[in-house]
């Protein structure tokens, strides 16, 4: 069984986005692992494993427009099912 079962990925389109601030927020406030937050001031790609993807979406939506949202259940994938 995975500790964090949802692979959460999305793009944030915003202004003055700060990779370091986003990384700090995730580390301090969201439960999960495998964080990737990369991009520039206008566009950030997020990848994060969590059990609470809605918290990721809520935070990211507060930073700008979110799109290309993918939430996959890795436990189902591990069992050979659609995630």
Predicted features along the sequence, with ranges:
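N-terminal loops that bind phosphate or other acidic moieties
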Residues: 1-83
């Amino acid at each position: 069984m995975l500790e964090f079962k949802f692979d959460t990925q999305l793009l944030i389109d915003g202004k003055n986005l700060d990779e370091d601030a986003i990384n700090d927020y995730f580390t301090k406030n969201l439960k999960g692992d495998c964080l990737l937050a990369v991009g520039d001031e206008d566009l950030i790609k997020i990848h994060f494993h969590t059990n609470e993807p809605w918290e990721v979406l809520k935070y990211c939506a507060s930073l700008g427009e979110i799109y290309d949202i993918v939430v996959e259940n890795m436990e189902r994938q591990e069992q050979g099912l659609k995630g």
